[in-house]
């Protein structure tokens, strides 16, 4: 190199303009020229990567990266769309070092191990580029495979000379960036270990200066990252640098090794001061932290930016943190964006490769041990499904370059090779399409085994589920999309709920009927509902009620265990082979010879089953619950003189009812059942459905035997439907009974429609439970139940619902006295047809502090139990399920977003809501003591549901995502 070079841009010619702005060097251009040698050597990958990373840091909100432990992991990262790669010293120590041994992160491995891994990564990326280019018509890869690598140089493996040599080795390996930490190399520890010892500030500056010198000598604008471990290090080698003096605890004395002790109280400020000293010598600064805290990051960034406003930072999103413990899901979603806005431009997960490899292999091995080849087939199904996202490793021969070397072979032999490897391989024969044929494919399960599930999750049953979902799930999703559009039109005042003029002829035609009612369903005067746990199934069927509705929906928390154990319990109950022994009292529970008729409520159309995937997409919860039950039990029930009977929840339109009708027909044909064998009752629990009663019955006329007044969800739907319209503000929910005008009109309209069509009109739920410790309160509660059931029987309902076996005798007495026949379908109501105004009239009442607090308390209590796997919860002497929690949170949302006033004149605002949630959370936590609970998570969800801009459709969908993410 000529001595004519005057500045470092002439020495590092590839550096873009402004690259070294603010960078300080304690050496001269002449020093670089003297050390470079007489021949220029190009380091193409390192130079290209450094400039690319520099550009990304200045154009992206932040650059995310994962730690790669192998070359293939890096290939998959780039294929998935990541633009940078991290090389972790911890991962090198654990399983990627040149000694071939396993070490903790204490710089015990050979110093060349990191550069060797960088070489392997770049070679793998090069091969991926070559393979893709070889297959392309223009011989160019579709993407830039050479993602810049930021590599871990630990503490330099020694002094400044070691840092110099290590930087050169990383540049030769093609690294784009390198970071050095300010620990003592001989005592080096992982950033999340104890016993870390800092070196003096001046000594680390020499290390940074040495690494910059090495990059300049190589002519590469390598990104240098200075890491400080001052936040959690409590020891310092020497007090030679006066800049370290304010942070030394001289009173504590020195350690046995002679190290100085550091003050605990000044850790963040020490990081800031060290970062300010390092800033002129580095491109980015990294403060290693002991927990993910936005406040600490902001304090650090603002402290450095006071002196160096343009300095960028790196952030370790460490696997050593328990992320869920520190951050809520909503906080996690915005965590990296907030960091990026503060200047943390390079954000990485150090040990991603190690944990991804360890967990995925353990999970496969565990499942392989239990399921054999079904486990590996499940992995393949996941691979097939990922192909639509760009995944290609399912074709592993092609992935590693077999086709590429076939091209080499053909080139060598002039195109005459007869020994190419990919042609004729099993991969070519079996993996030409992303998935197996439909006849061969079943579906993939992502959850753990449940004891006894082998009799439920049989290959034939899974194939039936696959067929049901393939046939009907796309239509379900379209109908859900239509729901959203209808709601948007109401929100924007483009449409108001009304009767459909196009079906007026159908409504007025008195000549058609619903389905013929089976003998064992003629008398339904008392129906008991509840979840499908084993004890509940036995007690409910033995309760004296005519019908037991086994519930997979509102009174169920849809964990995988609950869904599978529920199916197992119903399978056994259908065969009169169910028993239960209480684990503490040892009391035995068995099924009586005479018991209730069984009906099953699957989940609503809106709920997915995320543990069962087809093409990596969730299946329908409705079809899962319905499909498994009908597949295993339909013929057994028919043989007993009964049949497969269902309750259908959450329908909003006749189109959704028609979907169920088509599912029934398909199922009957598929399972060899006579048309009309499947019977159903539809819950009218949405305001929009009340405008389509006749249309819903007509859609299901071959199967339907009744409608039911789902009162709690109906009130919730009223709030949700008119969520954007202030004039529909409701009073406290306990002021809205079935005698409220819009509720009474709806229930009478249900009776009128049902009896006209020859089917049952079922009354609503009595959620009260016996109050054993207070006879006066119990008598009062039972009096309310009695009055409600008398109203139902007088109006013409053919039966009613209760939630507790203790209410069965009371409800039965009322209907026995007032309905001597099995039903009163012959009782036709002659009242005038309802108008849209009748069905939407706004109830009068007040909003009280007690009602406001009760809504918060009920929703918190319910969500706490729901997240723990229990969907039916006794609260305040009522059996609460999802419906009552939905009313409560929806009212809170409505009141907050429309500035509703309490009767004492206070406006319900965000402050009052958050304050009350916090107070109720604290009260519940104190009361819970050491009992396992999910109250904090429940509070997070409740605050989200109440304060969000747009009301969520169902709280159970968001809460379900949390269950699935936690492996339940």
From Swiss-Prot:
Keyword entries, A-Z: Glyoxylate bypass, Lyase, Multifunctional enzyme, Transferase, Tricarboxylic acid cycle
InterPro entries noted in UniProt: ICL/PEPM (IPR039556), Isocitrate_lyase (IPR006254), Isocitrate_lyase_ph_CS (IPR018523), Malate_synth_C_sf (IPR044856), Malate_synth_sf (IPR011076), Malate_synthA (IPR006252), Malate_synthase_CS (IPR019830), Malate_synthase_TIM (IPR001465)
Chain segments carrying region Malate synthase: 444-968
Cross-referenced CDD domains: ICL_PEPM, malate_synt_A
Catalytic center residues: 601, 881
Entry's EC annotation: 4.1.3.1, 2.3.3.9
Gene3D superfamilies according to UniProt: Malate synthase, domain 3 (3.20.20.360), Malate synthase, domain III (1.20.1220.12), Phosphoenolpyruvate-binding domains (3.20.20.60)
Annotated spans, Isocitrate lyase: 1-443
Reaction it catalyzes: D-threo-isocitrate = glyoxylate + succinate; glyoxylate + acetyl-CoA + H2O = (S)-malate + CoA + H(+)
Any matching Pfam family: ICL
A GO molecular-function descriptor: malate synthase activity
GO BP annotation list: determination of adult lifespan; glyoxylate cycle; tricarboxylic acid cycle
Annotated pathway: Carbohydrate metabolism; glyoxylate cycle; (S)-malate from isocitrate: step 1/2; Carbohydrate metabolism; glyoxylate cycle; (S)-malate from isocitrate: step 2/2
GO cellular component: mitochondrion
Tissue: Intestinal and body wall muscle cells.
Entry similarity comment: In the N-terminal section; belongs to the isocitrate lyase/PEP mutase superfamily. Isocitrate lyase family. In the C-terminal section; belongs to the malate synthase family.
Name assigned to this protein: Bifunctional glyoxylate cycle protein
Source organism per UniProt: Caenorhabditis elegans
Source species taxonomy: Eukaryota, Metazoa, Ecdysozoa, Nematoda, Chromadorea
């Amino acid at each position: 190199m000529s001595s004519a070079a005057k500045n470092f841009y002439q020495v590092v010619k590839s550096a873009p303009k402004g690259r070294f702005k603010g960078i300080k060097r304690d050496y001269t251009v002449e020093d670089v020229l003297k050390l470079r040698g007489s021949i220029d050597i190009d380091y193409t990958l390192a130079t290209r990567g450094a400039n690319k990373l520099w550009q990304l840091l200045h154009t992206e909100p932040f650059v995310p990266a994962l730690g790669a432990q192998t070359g293939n992991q890096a290939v998959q990262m780039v294929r998935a769309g990541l633009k940078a790669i991290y090389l972790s010293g911890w991962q090198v120590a654990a399983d990627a070092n040149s000694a071939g041994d396993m070490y903790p992160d204490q710089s015990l491995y050979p110093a060349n191990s990191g550069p060797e891994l960088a070489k392997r990564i770049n070679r793998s990326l090069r091969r991926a580029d070559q393979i893709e280019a070889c297959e392309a018509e223009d011989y160019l890869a579709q993407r830039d495979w050479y993602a810049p690598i930021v590599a871990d140089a630990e503490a330099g493996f020694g002094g400044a000379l070691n840092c110099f040599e290590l930087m050169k080795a990383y540049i030769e390996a093609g690294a784009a960036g390198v970071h050095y930490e300010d620990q003592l190399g001989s005592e080096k520890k992982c950033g999340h270990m104890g016993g870390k010892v800092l070196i003096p500030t001046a000594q680390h500056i020499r290390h940074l200066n040495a690494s910059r010198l090495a990059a300049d000598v190589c002519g590469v604008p390598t990104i240098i990252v200075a890491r400080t471990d001052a936040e959690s290090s409590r020891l310092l080698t020497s007090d030679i640098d006066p800049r370290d003096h304010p942070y030394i605890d001289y009173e504590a004395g020195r350690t046995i090794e002679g190290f100085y002790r550091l003050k605990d109280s000044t850790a963040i400020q020490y990081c800031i001061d060290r970062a300010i000293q390092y800033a002129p010598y580095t491109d980015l600064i990294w403060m290693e932290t002991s927990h993910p805290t936005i406040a600490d990051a902001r304090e650090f960034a603002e402290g450095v930016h006071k002196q160096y406003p343009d300095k960028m930072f790196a952030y370790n999103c460490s696997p050593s943190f328990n992320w869920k413990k520190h951050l809520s899901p909503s906080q996690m979603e915005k965590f990296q964006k907030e960091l990026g806005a503060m200047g943390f431009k390079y954000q990485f997960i150090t040990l991603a490769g190690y944990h991804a490899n360890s967990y995925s292999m353990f999970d496969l091995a565990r499942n392989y041990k239990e399921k054999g080849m079904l486990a590996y087939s499940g992995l393949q199904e996941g691979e097939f499904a990922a192909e639509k996202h760009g995944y290609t490793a399912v074709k592993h021969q092609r992935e590693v370059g077999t086709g590429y070397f076939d091209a080499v072979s053909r080139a060598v032999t002039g195109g005459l090779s007869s020994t190419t490897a990919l042609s004729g391989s099993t991969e070519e024969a079996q993996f030409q399409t992303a998935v197996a044929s439909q006849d061969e494919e079943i579906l993939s399960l992502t959850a753990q085994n449940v004891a006894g599930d082998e009799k439920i999750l049989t290959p034939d049953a899974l194939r039936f589920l696959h067929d049901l979902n393939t046939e009907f799930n796309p239509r379900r999703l379209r109908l859900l999309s239509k729901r959203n559009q209808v709601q948007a039109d109401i929100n924007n005042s483009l449409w108001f709920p009304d009767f459909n003029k196009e079906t007026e002829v159908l409504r007025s035609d008195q000549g058609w009927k619903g389905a013929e009612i089976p003998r064992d369903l003629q008398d339904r005067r008392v129906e008991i509902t509840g979840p499908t746990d084993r004890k509940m199934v036995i007690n409910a069927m033995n309760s004296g009620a005519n019908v037991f509705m086994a519930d997979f929906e509102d009174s169920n928390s849809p964990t995988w265990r609950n869904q599978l154990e529920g199916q197992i319990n119903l399978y056994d109950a259908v065969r009169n082979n169910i028993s239960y022994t209480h684990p503490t009292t040892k009391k035995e529970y068995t099924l009586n010879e005479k018991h209730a008729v069984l009906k099953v409520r699957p989940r609503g159309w809106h709920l997915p089953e995320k543990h069962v995937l087809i093409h990596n997409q969730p299946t329908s919860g409705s079809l899962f619950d319905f499909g498994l039950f009908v597949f295993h039990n339909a013929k057994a029930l028919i043989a007993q003189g009964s049949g497969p009977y269902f309750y259908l929840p959450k329908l909003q339109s006749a189109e959704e009812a028609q979907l169920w009708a088509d599912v029934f027909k398909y199922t009957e044909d598929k399972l060899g059942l006579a048309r009309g064998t499947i019977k159903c009752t539809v819950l009218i629990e949405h305001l929009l459905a009340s405008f389509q009663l006749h249309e819903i019955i007509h859609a299901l006329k071959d199967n339907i035997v009744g409608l039911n007044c789902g009162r709690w969800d109906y009130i919730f739907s009223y709030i949700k439907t008119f969520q954007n319209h202030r004039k529909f503000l409701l009073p406290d929910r306990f002021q809205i009974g079935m005698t409220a005008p819009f509720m009474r009109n709806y229930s009478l309209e249900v009776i009128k429609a049902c009896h006209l069509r020859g089917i049952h009109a079922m009354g609503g739920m009595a959620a009260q439970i016996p109050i054993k410790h207070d006879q006066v309160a119990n008598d009062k509660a039972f009096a309310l139940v009695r009055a409600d059931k008398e109203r139902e029987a007088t109006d013409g309902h053919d039966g009613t619902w209760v939630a507790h076996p203790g209410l069965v005798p009371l409800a039965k007495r009322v209907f026995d006295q007032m309905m001597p026949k099995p039903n009163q379908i012959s009782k036709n109501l002659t009242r005038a047809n309802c108008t849209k105004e009748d069905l939407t009239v706004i109830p009068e009442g007040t909003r009280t502090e007690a009602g406001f607090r009760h809504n918060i308390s009920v929703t918190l209590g319910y969500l706490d139990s729901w997240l723990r796997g229990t969907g039916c919860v006794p609260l305040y002497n009522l059996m609460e399920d999802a419906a009552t929690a939905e009313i409560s949170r929806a009212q809170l949302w409505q009141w907050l977003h429309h500035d509703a006033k309490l009767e004492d004149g206070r406006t319900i605002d965000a402050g009052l809501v958050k304050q009350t949630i916090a107070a109720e959370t604290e009260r519940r936590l104190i009361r819970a003591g050491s009992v396992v609970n999910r109250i904090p998570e429940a509070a997070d969800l409740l605050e989200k549901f109440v304060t969000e801009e747009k009301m969520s459709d169902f709280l159970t969908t968001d809460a379900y995502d949390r269950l699935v993410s936690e492996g339940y």
